[in-house]
């Protein structure tokens, strides 16, 4: 047990501790911070527009790496610049999942979707897509789950969360996560309480940069924004290199004038969905849609989100699903519960096998 606890402590205090950047309003962001943040990514992929099967184009190997990262390509080995059947199949599935016209070609709408900031969790696992995009027989339900439908045990309806201590987050930032947890608590029987102990908490949240020990390195601003594990592992990692905007929680959806700032609550609500067992959805208005444009704020659960989470846990017994059941904050300390951490360390080893993210 001592060895395991030491491993946990080493993980949190040696993997690229970072002071993430938070802004309370757009005007406080230095102008140079948000100039052409996605230009490099677009320039990298825009030259691929219009190419089709049978061609060999410089840069297609990077696109294949992107598709492999998110589960659309399952083959191993080096990626080539050949537009082959494997790539065409990946494009077809991607277009279907994101409600694009299925052409198997790299049209501009597909490429523009690819360069949008997004969640780092894959859309397909073991080559199987659960997003249901474009399926005729299931037109209203597009939510998905992790393989095997993992969920928190029925006996555990009071979950605790803690923040990685090296981030030194302010109370203002922590309140953003409290609001995000509340949105899921309002429609389920789950309750969420903040703890000060990462060893005692069910869920641990941290901001990291680049490679941070779980095999899923972050790529800098405006790429992958965050990733989270399925239950009951309970890890939520966010990219500390993003320009995170902290709103006051009064506006549920808006488009900000600066398109390279990322709304923290929007990402937090999405990743908590993963922590509770939801996969990605092909409903663009749903919280669990994989991508979010820079400057967008989306925090209200859609019908698809609510139906998905209630499929796992049922509704809120204290209301009709829309009542207020705020997450609680406490000063819990101590504790040496490590059962969850065994699952975490096994998960980290599994995740690190072959997944990596292209930098563009």
UniProtKB/Swiss-Prot annotation:
Major enzyme class: hydrolase
Binding site residues for Zn(2+): 119, 270, 274, 280
Pro-peptide positions on chain: 21-142, 338-360
GO biological process: defense response to fungus; proteolysis
Lipidation (GPI-anchor amidated serine): 337
Thermal dependence summary for this entry: Optimum temperature is 35 degrees Celsius.
UniProt-annotated location(s): Cell membrane
Function per UniProt: Matrix metalloproteinases (MMPs) or matrixins may play a role in the degradation and remodeling of the extracellular matrix (ECM) during development or in response to stresses. Active on Mca-KESAbuNLFVLKDpaR-NH(2) (QF75) and, to some extent, on McaPLGLDpaAR-NH(2) (QF24), myelin basic protein (MBP) and beta-casein.
Name of this protein: Metalloendoproteinase 5-MMP
Species whose genome carries this gene: Arabidopsis thaliana
UniProt lineage: Eukaryota, Viridiplantae, Streptophyta, Embryophyta, Tracheophyta
Gene that this sequence comes from: 5MMP
């Amino acid at each position: 047990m001592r060895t395991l606890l030491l491993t946990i402590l080493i993980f949190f205090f040696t993997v690229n501790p970072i002071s993430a950047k938070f802004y309370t309003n757009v005007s406080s962001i230095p102008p140079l911070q948000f100039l052409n943040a996605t230009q490099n990514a677009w320039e990298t992929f825009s030259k691929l527009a219009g190419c089709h099967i049978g061609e060999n184009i410089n840069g297609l190997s990077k696109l294949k790496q992107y598709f492999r990262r998110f589960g659309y390509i399952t083959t191993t080995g080096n990626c080539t610049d050949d537009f082959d059947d494997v790539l065409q199949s990946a494009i077809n599935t991607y277009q279907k999942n994101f409600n694009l016209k299925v052409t198997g070609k790299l049209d501009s709408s597909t490429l523009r979707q690819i360069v949008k900031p997004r969640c780092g969790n894959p859309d397909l696992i073991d080559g199987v897509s659960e997003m249901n995009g474009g399926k005729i027989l299931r037109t209203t339900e597009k939510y998905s789950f992790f393989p095997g439908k993992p969920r928190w045990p029925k006996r555990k309806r009071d979950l605790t969360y803690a923040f990685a201590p090296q981030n030194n987050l302010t109370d203002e930032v922590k309140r953003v996560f409290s609001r995000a947890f509340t949105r899921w608590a309002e429609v389920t029987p789950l309750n969420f309480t903040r703890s000060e102990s990462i060893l005692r908490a069910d869920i641990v949240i941290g901001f990291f940069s680049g490679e941070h020990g779980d095999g899923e390195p972050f790529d800098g601003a405006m790429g992958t924004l965050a990733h989270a594990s399925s239950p009951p592992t309970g890890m939520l990692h966010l990219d500390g290199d993003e320009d995170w905007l902290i709103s006051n929680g009064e506006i549920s959806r808006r488009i900000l004038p600066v398109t390279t700032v990322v709304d923290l609550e929007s990402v937090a609500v999405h990743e908590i969905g993963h922590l509770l067992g939801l996969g990605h959805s092909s409903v663009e208005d749903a919280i669990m849609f994989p991508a979010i444009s820079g400057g967008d704020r989306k925090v209200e659960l859609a019908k698809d989100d609510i139906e998905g989470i209630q499929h796992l846990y049922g509704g809120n017994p204290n209301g009709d699903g829309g009542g207020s059941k705020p997450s609680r904050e406490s000063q819990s300390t101590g504790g040496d519960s490590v059962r969850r951490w065994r699952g975490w360390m096994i998960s980290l080893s599994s995740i690190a096998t072959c997944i990596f993210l292209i930098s563009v």
